[in-house]
Amino acid sequence: MSSSRPPARRRRKILPQINTLTVGVVFVALTAIGLVVATKQQEANVNRADALGGVMADKSGPFANYLLVGSDTRETADPNSPDYGGIGSTNEAGGRRSDTVMILHVDNELGTASMMSLPRDLWVDIPGFGKDRLNSAYSHGPEVLVDTIQTSLGIPLNHYIEVDFTSFKNIVSALGGVDVCFEYPTRDINTGLNVPTPGCFTLDQYQSLAYARSRYYEVFREDAWDVDGRADLGRIERQQIFLQAAISKAIQQTTANPMRTSELINAAVNSLTVDPGLNLLEAADYLRPLASGGVKRYPLSVVPDMIDDKEVLVLGAEAGAVLAYFAGTAGPPPVG
């Protein structure tokens, strides 16, 4: 491991390979688990984005859609942290950008929850700003991101939950690390991920963030480093692997000791931003399927393209069925 980061701890018992058919990023979903038992005092400490009040869709029918955003921002980051240089950027206001965007579709009547990750390179029409990557919409404010998704993809968004990377690391630290298995030696020289030997390890908060953010993921096999050419799409899959492990650990800890739930919430609450209309206690009823493990992942069909000299992703031929399901106008499509 790099000397600037505490090393991952080798686990004595090898875990089975983690199933990839799970849900998005850990910092958002662990916050959702925490909301299930949120207290009034903790709710008062949550930041409210007032600009979202006029753009969120009214809830209709038995389902609710939550936009879950993981933001890459230096606003709450510690300048002395070993990964500070990789968070945000010096040429953006506040070094702020969306790193992960997902939609959680919860049907309280059926007791089911579904997740869809939106690639940040998805080419969309940003109202008032023209066409660009989805990631660019967030730089104009969370209300523009919400408006973009609703108008470009036709999916009503009822609520907004955003957590930054400081909160991510706090949650992983509160969990005591997260267990992840690697089939080969693995690295990402851009994020600092460094796993020199295959096996299962408990990743600390720094290596966990490096793993979850990795877009230039390499494995060492057949005497050479082999890069994962899927970039953002590969990163989405790895985030889902990481999340399953983190959720499992959080559920185990909070089941054995309910006080751990409050500790996990406190680890995230100061870096949590939600829409003005979100009642955390009311939302708990809709988010219970996360805690019970009943979450199904639906991949969004996309294909690479070159537009305005930019490498982007555009919707694929099979995207319509998934978008219609999340919009509430059709039933769930089959998962391949």
Predicted regions and their residues:
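Soluble non-cytosolic domains of exported or imported proteins
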Residues: 94-98, 128-129, 136-144, 162-166, ...
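Flexible, polar/acidic helix-loop-strand segments at domain edges
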Residues: 173-255, 336
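Amphipathic, coiled-coil-like alpha-helical scaffolding segments used for oligomerization/assembly
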Residues: 134-198, 284-287
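Extracytoplasmic
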Residues: 61-64, 96-101, 110-113, 118, ...
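Entry/capping segment at the start of metal-dependent catalytic domains
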Residues: 4-110
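Extracytoplasmic/secreted envelope proteins and their assembly/folding machinery
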Residues: 98-100, 115, 131, 142-150, ...
